[in-house]
Each structure stands twice: as C-alpha cells, then as structure tokens.
Amino acid sequence: ALPIFRMAQSPDPEARIYTRFVDAPEDANGKLQSIAFKNEQSFNFAFDIVDALGREKPEKLAMLHVALDGTERRFTFKDMKDASSQAANYFTSLGIRRGDRVMLVLKRHYQFWFAILGLHKIGAIAIPATNQLVEHDFSYRFQAAGVSAVLCTADGDTAHHVDIAEADTGMKLT
C-alpha cells in the first residue's frame, strides 16, 4: 500500500483560501465526505487563488523547479502573481483575447506556469501539449481545437514542426 501523507492545515477553516470556492466537509478522521463548488461562473484560478496568495502570503513558496542540471529556482506566490500578470499583458499585446485557444508546448520548463496562469487571467483557453508532437500531430490539433496561437519551446525541433503545420493547414497563428 502507498503511504498517505496529510497536509498540515490551518486550524481555522476560514484561513484556507479554497473555502471561498469549495465546500468540502470532512469527517473526524479528515476523510472527505462530499464536495460542492461555489462561485463557479466567476472563478478564475489565477486571480482567485494564486494572486490572493500573492497578496496574503507573498513570501510563501509556490514552486520549486529543479532543472536537469540540478539548478534550483524558487518562486513565491508573489513571484507567480507578478510573472503571470506580465505574461497576461504580453499575450494581450499579441492580440490574444478571452476565448482564444492557445497551445502550450513547453516541456517541463517553469515558464509553463507563468504562461498558463497568464492565459487564465485573460480568459484564454490553454491547451497543454507534449513536445513529442510532429507536423501532422500539430496540424490535426490546430484544426480540431481551433488553435489561434502557440507558445512553444525553442528546444529541439518543436518550433520547426509548428511552423510546418501552420503552413500545411493554411492557418495564421499568433
């Protein structure tokens, strides 16, 4: 059997940000009894969770990224809030708008998180994809999903495959 790890929780349920959006009563042993979502129509993970933590607990560690060479990068919730806002502004400057479908092909780069949160902030739809796709895979996905923009890694041949697929489909991607 796999070990079970319990997260240390604040004794005050109101101190937990997620309680603004989720009703998740637990029994005396901490077992989830049910789950119900609140404010579904206006919920935005980037604003309502990440940015809230960036304001309320700015120095709290949000992400630890360890690169293949062992380089560690630490990002606080304030870092995530600020970087995702910069990404959102950049995407908006490119013409990406609410409802646009944007494919993210970023391998395991930490920038994926800034990008996906930035897209959430502007209401765009993020479509994560593996960097193992080739031209025909991209062509199919571009057409099937109505992709309007692609953010991809410069590693390997990914950008080349995206360019060929864009030309093959006749689509003009941002």
Task: Identify the role of each PLM range.
Residues V50-G54, M80, S84, V102, ...:
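Adenylate-forming
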Residues G70-F75, N89-H136:
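Conserved AMP-binding/adenylate-forming
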Residues F5-E14, S93-L94, L117, K121-T174:
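Structural core segment of the AMP-binding/adenylate-forming
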Residues I49-T76:
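AMP-dependent adenylate-forming
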Residues V66-L68, D79-Y90:
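Conserved N-terminal alpha-helix of the aminotransferase class I/II PLP-enzyme fold
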Residues A1:
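Extracellular interaction modules
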Residues I4-A46:
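Flexible, non-catalytic linker and terminal segments flanking ANL/adenylate-forming cores
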